[in-house]
């Protein structure tokens, strides 16, 4: 089993993890970082000028990196002995596993969060909603996950899921930052349908983060100020409940 992460734009400090001798650890980076622990540090062949896109691409398109069972973890969260033990069980049991979000939102609620925090300009989000509606995705299907950890094998279904997970970040060639919890749900619908992806409880402590940069250090934040109007229009496009 491989556990991998990406420390792009020196966004995180490496936490004090528990390391298992039977696990291979791989960290991708683009700028000089402190290298500690038994990681294999690999300088990323960056495909994009935006460091966030490089980090997202690494997380989403894991089938391009590994043939073995592999676990993504955001670089700011700490792995415990129990985390590694559970990870071995998850990859033994399922071809892909996701975590239930501890504070679930609807699809529209997730889009509104993205709007409210300014990660995506309003006009682009409207176009993204239209793309989702055109896919046939039903908002009632959406079961909110948190993707700071994902357990995967390199199978044909996982490859297809990865590609939808990545591609639904884009609309008309423009990237929609911080909407991956929605795009993973769309990917699940398009690939797995009624089969669903197995869910597990949260496996990391979100309150313990080694992140050293703010969103403003890496994202171009938009000033979205018409939330009531946006909610009404996006709801009609998606045919979604609040």
Model-flagged regions — what are they?
Residues 8-11, 32-33, 47-49, 77-79, ...:
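Short, solvent-exposed loop/turn segments at secondary-structure junctions
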Residues 116-228:
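Catalytic core and acceptor-binding pocket of nucleotide-sugar-dependent glycosyltransferases
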Residues 79-112:
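Conserved donor-nucleotide/metal-binding helix-loop-beta segment in metal-dependent transferases, i.e.
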Residues 21, 59, 73, 144-147, ...:
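Residues that flank catalytic or metal-binding motifs in active/ligand-binding sites
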Residues 1-55, 65, 69, 169-177, ...:
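N-terminal anchoring/stem segment of glycosyltransferases
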Residues 14-17, 62, 82-87:
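A short acidic, amphipathic alpha-helical/loop segment
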Residues 68-77:
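Short beta-strand-to-loop acidic/aromatic patch adjacent to the donor-nucleotide binding site
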Residues 50-60, 85, 128-135:
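Short acidic (Asp/Glu) patches
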């Amino acid at each position: 089993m491989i556990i991998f992460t990406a420390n792009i734009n020196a966004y995180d400090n490496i936490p004090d993890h528990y390391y298992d001798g039977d696990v291979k650890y791989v960290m991708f980076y683009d700028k000089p970082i402190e290298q500690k622990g038994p990681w294999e540090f690999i300088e990323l062949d960056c495909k994009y000028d935006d460091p966030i896109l490089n980090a997202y691409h690494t997380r989403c398109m894991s089938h391009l990196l590994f043939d073995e069972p592999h676990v993504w973890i955001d670089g700011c969260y700490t792995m415990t002995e129990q985390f590694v033990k559970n990870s071995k069980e998850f990859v033994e049991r399922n071809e892909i596993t996701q975590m239930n979000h501890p504070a679930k939102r609807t699809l529209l609620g997730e889009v509104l969060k993205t709007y409210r925090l300014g990660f995506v300009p309003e006009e682009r989000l409207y176009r993204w909603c239209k793309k989702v509606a055109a896919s046939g995705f039903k908002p009632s299907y959406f079961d909110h996950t948190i993707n700071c950890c994902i357990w995967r094998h390199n199978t044909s279904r996982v490859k297809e899921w990865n590609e939808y997970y990545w591609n639904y970040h884009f609309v008309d060639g423009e990237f929609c930052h911080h909407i991956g919890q929605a795009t993973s749900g769309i990917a699940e619908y398009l690939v797995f349908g009624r089969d669903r992806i197995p869910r597990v409880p949260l496996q990391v402590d979100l309150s313990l983060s080694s992140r050293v940069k703010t969103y403003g250090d890496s994202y171009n934040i938009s000033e979205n100020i018409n939330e009531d109007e946006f909610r009404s229009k996006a709801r009609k496009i998606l045919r979604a409940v609040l």
